[in-house]
C-alpha cells in the first residue's frame, strides 16, 4: 500500500482527477494518498477489506468492486463434484460476478 500511495500521490500532484486501484494494496494506497492530498480526486478500487470500507465511509474512495467468495466457493465445489462424477463441467470460465460497494451499500 505504501508504494501505491506514493504512485497515487504523484498522479494527484500532476492533476489526475481519478485513480483506480486494481487490488487491495493499490486501493488502500490510493485512498490514503487522496486523504493526505486533501483534494477532490475520485478513487475507485477492487477488493474488500475493513480498511477499504473505512476509506469509503470517510469519503476518500468512492466505491470498490468486491469479489463474491461465497459464489466462487459454491461454483468451485459444484464443478469439482461434476468432474469427480465424470460429468461435463461446462464452461471453462465461470463468471461469479462482483458487488459494487459504496457509501449507500455499506
Language model: regions and residue ranges:
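A residue-level marker of the well-folded mature domains of exported/periplasmic proteins
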Residues: 1-106
Amino acid at each position: 500500500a505504501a508504494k501505491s500511495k506514493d504512485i497515487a500521490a504523484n498522479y494527484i500532484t500532476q492533476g489526475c482527477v481519478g485513480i483506480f486501484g486494481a487490488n487491495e494494496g493499490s486501493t488502500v494506497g490510493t485512498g490514503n494518498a487522496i486523504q493526505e492530498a486533501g483534494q477532490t480526486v475520485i478513487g475507485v478500487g477492487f477488493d474488500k477489506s475493513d480498511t477499504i470500507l473505512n476509506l469509503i465511509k470517510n469519503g476518500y474512495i468512492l466505491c470498490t468492486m468486491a469479489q463474491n467468495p461465497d459464489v466462487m466457493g459454491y461454483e468451485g465445489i459444484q464443478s469439482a463434484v461434476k468432474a469427480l462424477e465424470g460429468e461435463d463441467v461446462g464452461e471453462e470460465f465461470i463468471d461469479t460476478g462482483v458487488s459494487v460497494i459504496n457509501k449507500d451499500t455499506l
